[in-house]
Every structure is written in structure tokens, then in C-alpha cells.
């Protein structure tokens, strides 16, 4: 190989070799979803702590969940949704593949402190299970009909934001400013 050809090829090979690890480390969809879940976690848990116990029993009208019931529902689904990706919810939750187990979990009597502790544990579980999902598994079917594992994790994230918005409305209806808006 001639010296002039080597001067052209060597830098190209070096650049390609340096770019490969950078491309392999590019954040994937799970990194983006986890970032979003962590942000929602901070806000939902922050609202739960900021709202006095008297506001936890408030509901906007008959048939609507109370504030406490929304926190418990978020907790339950943080355990239930990963089940659709093949995870096993902690045994003490009683949550399995049948959605009726979610209803049973939500009906348990709890104090405010118990709800706060369980809410935080459920987010830790959700994040752990999302983190354990390799990008290659995202295109595979979940246990739920017509839903890929990717769609399941996206649904989990949008579910959190749906209830975050609901909880913001509940807080403001009770003249409580969300902590991040102060």
C-alpha cells in the first residue's frame, strides 16, 4: 500500500472506529421513557406529599375517584403494567395478570403514610422493570392483545401523565399549588 493511500485511509478508519462506540451508546427509547417516568414520579410524589390529608378525600363529583384513590390507582398500575411485559409484581401486592387483582389491591384500607410509601415503592418497581427491558425486546408482543412491549411502556408513561394532570386539577381545586410551580 502506498504512503499517500495510507494517509487517506487511516484517518477514515480511525474516525469510523471512534464513531462506532458513540453510536452504540446513543440513548434509546427506553432511556427517553425512563426520563419521563422519573419526572412524572417526582411530580406525583411531590403532589402527594404537598396535599394535606383533608384534600385526599376530596373528589370532583359522584363516581369520580378521590385524590387518595387516584394515588392508589397509580400505585396499582405501576405494578400491573410491567406484568404485561412479563414481570412479576411483588407478592405482597397480590397483583397478577388478571385485572381483578388490581381492583382488589385498590380496595385495601391504607393510611396516608402507607399510600405514600407504597406509591414510592411502586415507582421503584416500574423503573426497575423498565430498566431491565432491552431495546431488542421492545418489538416483541406483550402479554396484552395487540400491544408490543414498546407500546406497553409508552402506555405506562402516558398513563402517569394522564393522572398527573388529574392530580394537578384536584390540587388546584383545593387551592394547593403544585410544588414545582411555587
Task: Please place each PLM-identified region on the residue numbering.
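Boundary of Sec targeting at the N-terminus
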Residues: 24-27
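N-terminal secretory signal peptides that target proteins for export/translocation
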Residues: 1-6
Amino acid at each position: 500500500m502506498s504512503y499517500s493511500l495510507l494517509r487517506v485511509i487511516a484517518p477514515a478508519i480511525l474516525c469510523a472506529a471512534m464513531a462506532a462506540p458513540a453510536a452504540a451508546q446513543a440513548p434509546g427509547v427506553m432511556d427517553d421513557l425512563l426520563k419521563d417516568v422519573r419526572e412524572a414520579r417526582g411530580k406525583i410524589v411531590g403532589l402527594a406529599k404537598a396535599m394535606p390529608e383533608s384534600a385526599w378525600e376530596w373528589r370532583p363529583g359522584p363516581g369520580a375517584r378521590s385524590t387518595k384513590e387516584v394515588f392508589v390507582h397509580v400505585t396499582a398500575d405501576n405494578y400491573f403494567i410491567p406484568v404485561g411485559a412479563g414481570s412479576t409484581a411483588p407478592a405482597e401486592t397480590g397483583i397478577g395478570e388478571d385485572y381483578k387483582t388490581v381492583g382488589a389491591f385498590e380496595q385495601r384500607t391504607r393510611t396516608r403514610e402507607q399510600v405514600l410509601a407504597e406509591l414510592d415503592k411502586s415507582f421503584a418497581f416500574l423503573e426497575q422493570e423498565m430498566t431491565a427491558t432491552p431495546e431488542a425486546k421492545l418489538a416483541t408482543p406483550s402479554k396484552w392483545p395487540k400491544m408490543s412491549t414498546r407500546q406497553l411502556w409508552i402506555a405506562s408513561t402516558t398513563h402517569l401523565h394522564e393522572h398527573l394532570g388529574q392530580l394537578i386539577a384536584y390540587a388546584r381545586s383545593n387551592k394547593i399549588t403544585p410544588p414545582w410551580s411555587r
